[in-house]
Amino acid sequence: MNASLVLGQANFTSRGAATTNSGLSEPHLIVFDASGNLWVTDTGNNRVLEFRPPFANGMAASLVIGQPDFVSSGVATTGSSLDFPTGIAFDNSGNLWVADLGNGRVLEFKPAFANGMSASLVLGQPDFTTVTIAPPTQSGLLAPFGIVFDSSGNLAVVDNNNNRTLIFTPSFSTHQNAALVLGQADFSSKVEATTATGQAGPNAVTAVF
């Protein structure tokens, strides 16, 4: 069937990337919040955009996270910046979580949301200004991609370059240790394996309720 509406382009026949309040560049994943707002990881522009209903073709976003405004797309390692964001999810309290792949971390943003706001918490790194590329640890991430919450509020993070999925349990805190690892025998291994227990460059994760 044909799509009924398009975001990121003025019409169904355009395909150009743009750094504007209505443009997108390499969008990866989307999620709806409890109010029906649509959130998009605009990966090529290093940002997350919120679109509020009613939706319309080529409409402008209402809010941007990861950049100070709608025309910037720079890369940085701060509490308010993103570098190649991919996974996106909301927890049961309405907090927004973003997998910041290029910075090797997952960020939590608490409402009320605002343009260019700072994150409240970071997983995968010791602070908001550090990017550590090191062997796997219980708290480290290397190119996190997909993220999802289960019905108990546990956060699953696909740790792509470490060939594993980590489970973090609430209550969450900066640089906390994961409670569980899937795809590896322990928290210090990163072996690629085509077995019932192994993983190799995983990208996405889901939860069954």
For the regions a language model picked out, list residue spans one by one.
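Short loop/turn segments immediately following the C-termini of beta-strands
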Residues: T43-G44, P53, L101-G102, P111, ...
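Conserved beta-propeller blade signature
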Residues: N37-W39, N95-W97, N154-A156
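Structural signal for beta-propeller blades
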Residues: N46-V48, G104-V106, N163-L166
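Residue-level detector of Asp-centered blade-edge/turn motifs that repeat once per structural unit
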Residues: F32-S35, F90-S93, F149-S152, F209
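Active-site helical microenvironments for divalent-metal-assisted chemistry
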Residues: S22, S80, G94, V148, ...
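Acidic active-site catalytic centers that drive phospho-/nucleotidyl reactions
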Residues: D42, D91, D100, D150, ...
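Gly/Pro-rich loop segments of beta-rich domains
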Residues: M1-H28, P54-T86, A112-F145, S171-F209
